[in-house]
């Protein structure tokens, strides 16, 4: 929704990943894109953008367009929110969206060092609570392992916060050393780091789906996936073929979804692929 613009310019991203997104900088462009997406057989849409200096994705101009998309298409609508207060959460819920995806950070120090925000970890908990109280149908927390320059700091606290809300899905990401950012040469989280995060999420949120999301290092991908499956992950974005075969060998029933890792279980049937 913001093109390549981001006021926050976090140290792990610097707006880099906005360049790979479809730009819909006006409400009319969002409606046109979603209409075309459905005509082409799309399942859903992730609506995101750069953040302002307060860590918010400025959604207010798009509320009516989001409402139109829900009323006029069959797309699953997932919105990446950033920080929200109760009023903003209620406005967003009134549009009828299906999913709110929220990045959750458990360390105040990491928030300051990486995001440059004066916010606290509890502000992310308040965002989760505001969305729940506003009755957004599905609130999906995302936790980035190694966000603080590759160090493991605050991930356990983030999971403890998330646990309070009984999420249907928890998405785990891994820091990617991104060219052109202050973190381009840091050591990313290891396969073991990712697996430990998966195991913690599985133990703390036993009823939730635990997903390895799309943003994670590609180095050591197969080993990370193997350990993640053994640790309790039940969703992996674009898994390697060997991981799929290994999961089958461990007794898992493997299903393929054409959609985002944050799709809640109750909507999975709309994204199932016939193989």
Name these PLM-found stretches.
Residues 1-28:
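Canonical Radical SAM [4Fe-4S] cluster-binding loop centered on the CxxxCxxC motif
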Residues 5, 14, 41, 96, ...:
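Conserved functional loop/turn residues at catalytic and ligand-binding sites
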Residues 6, 10-13, 34, 214, ...:
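Disulfide-bonded cysteines in secreted/extracellular proteins and peptides
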Residues 10, 47, 102, 201, ...:
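Conserved, mostly hydrophobic/aromatic
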Residues 18-32, 84, 153-157:
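Glycine-rich anion/phosphate-binding loops
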Residues 31, 156, 160-275:
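Auxiliary Fe-S-binding modules of radical SAM enzymes
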Residues 32-51:
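Short Fe-S-cluster ligation motifs
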Residues 54-208:
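Conserved AdoMet/S-adenosylmethionine-binding subsite of the radical SAM
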């Amino acid at each position: 929704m913001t093109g390549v613009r981001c006021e926050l310019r976090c140290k792990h991203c610097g707006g880099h990943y906005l360049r790979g997104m479809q730009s819909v900088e006006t409400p009319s462009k969002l409606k046109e894109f979603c209409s075309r997406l459905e005509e082409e057989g799309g399942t859903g849409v992730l609506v995101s953008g750069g953040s302002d200096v307060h860590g918010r994705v400025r959604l207010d101009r798009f509320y009516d367009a989001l409402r139109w998309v829900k009323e006029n298409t069959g797309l699953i609508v997932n919105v990446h929110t950033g920080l929200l207060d109760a009023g903003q959460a209620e406005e967003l819920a009134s549009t009828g969206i299906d999913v709110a995806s929220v990045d959750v950070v458990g360390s105040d120090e990491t928030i300051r060092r990486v995001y440059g925000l004066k916010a606290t970890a509890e502000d992310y908990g308040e965002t989760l609570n505001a969305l729940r109280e506003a009755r957004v149908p599905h609130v999906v927390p995302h936790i980035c392992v190694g966000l603080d320059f590759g160090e493991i700091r605050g991930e356990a606290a983030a999971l403890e916060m998330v646990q309070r809300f009984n999420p249907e899905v928890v998405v785990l990401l891994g820091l990617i050393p991104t060219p052109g950012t202050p973190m381009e040469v840091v050591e990313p989280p290891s396969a073991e780091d990712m697996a430990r995060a998966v195991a913690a999420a599985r133990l703390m949120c036993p009823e939730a789906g635990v997903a390895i999301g799309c943003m994670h290092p590609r180095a050591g991908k197969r080993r990370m996936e193997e350990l993640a499956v053994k640790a309790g992950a039940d969703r992996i974005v674009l898994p390697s073929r060997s991981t799929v075969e290994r999961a089958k060998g461990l007794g898992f029933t493997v299903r393929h979804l054409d959609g985002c890792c944050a799709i809640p279980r109750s909507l999975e049937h709309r994204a199932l692929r016939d193989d």
